[in-house]
Structure formats: C-alpha cells, structure tokens
Amino acid sequence: MSKTPYSGMGAIVGPEGVTFRVWAPHAEKVFITGSFNDWDDNIDEMEHEDDGYWAFHHPNAKVNDEYKFAIQTPTGRIQKSDPYALKMTHSNGNSVVFDLYEGYETHDYEMPSMNKLVIYELHVGTFNREGLEENQVGNFYKAAEKLDYLKSLGINAVEIMPVMEFPGDHSWGYNPSFPFSVEGSYGGPEGLRHFVFESHIRGIAVIMDVVYNHFGPDDLDLWQFDGWQ
C-alpha cells in the first residue's frame, strides 16, 4: 500500500488515487483487481485491518475505473463486486469508481414541513417515456422533464420508488442486488443527482423509497460474499 488509505468503505476517491476497503472476515487474502491494473488479481494484495476489514490504496485508480475484489477462500478464489459500490456496469457486472462530490452543484433548498407536503409517488421507469423506443424504460433525465407539470399540480414532494441496482431494466425496484448503487438503466448516480437538483430548484423535495430488509431472487453477488459456508 503506497499511501495511508482514506477512511470509509467501498471505493473512496481522493486527490492521490482511490482507497478500496471491504469487510470480508472469512477471507484468507483479498486482492483488488480492475481496469487500473489490467485486471491482474495477483499483484495488489489488500492489507488486513482489524475486525475483518481489508484495504488497499491504489494511486493509479480513478473515477470511472471498473473493479472487483478477488477473495481467497479455503476452497479457492472467487471474484466479487463491491457491496458498497455507488455505481455498477449492471447488476451482474463490475463495480465502478464514482466520486459523490465531482460535479456536485450546491443550492439553497429547504424542505416544507411534514404537514405541508403534497407527495407524488413516482416510478422512474414509466413516469415519462415520451420519445423512447417501445421497450426502453424511462430515466431520471426524462422524469426531470415533467417536473414543471408536477409543480403545476401543486406537488411539492416526489417519492421515487426504489432505484437501487436490480436485475434487468424493468422493475418496481423491490428486488435490489446492490443497496448503494443506483440503477444504471435509470441513469445511474449521475442521473439521480440531476433529478434531485432539478427538483430542488423548483421547490420539490425528493423522498427515497429504499429496500434494505431483503434482496431480490437474482444476481445475488453478495450471497456468501467471502466464502462463508
């Protein structure tokens, strides 16, 4: 490890590279592999920290690099995506380094009091499909195009149905695969950030419907993550 790692979990972006950290208490060894090291899963061995955590700071890793963890278990080596990934190529693909603060625009916004909220429940995939192909789902950018319409109805808050990464493109969102990653077909974390910004400048609050108590039946890369039996 070339430098003191940054604090946090997942892929933490800093001025001198990216720190990767994962909790894998049953692993014998963990390596980080990705586009920054030509997907070689034998050269960048992560340091075993306390309480089952593993970390590695890679000075050459950057935003939009893809990566996985190569976990050595008693029965062999397995490759797993990052449970804390903020972005995925797809629900059964690679994790992607994402910087929450890059391109972030600040603005003044204050949510109305609870007793004054007029909430519209919104499904991103079907709310606005105007101009899209028959089987193409809507996304955050298309949804943002109709925010003025919602405002004209007196709506001052939208509750978006779950947008955590799920298998396929068509879903209500209650079958998540990665709890911190934003569904790619909806526009990923960049799309969500755009939607929130456009909502706030119109005085519309954004409420997230989240699913943390269960996962879906497919693309369960987190199952037996570090080889536990």
Residues of each region from the PLM?
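Short proline/glycine-enriched turn/loop motifs at strand-loop junctions of beta-rich domains
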Residues: 23-30
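Short beta-strand elements bearing conserved aromatic residues within extracellular beta-rich modules
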Residues: 30-32, 67
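Glycine-rich, histidine-containing beta strand-loop boundary motifs that form or position
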Residues: 22, 34, 58, 71, ...
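Substrate-binding/active-site clefts of carbohydrate-active enzymes
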Residues: 111-114, 123-229
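The feature marks proteins involved in alpha-glucan
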Residues: 1-19, 44, 48-121, 126-135, ...
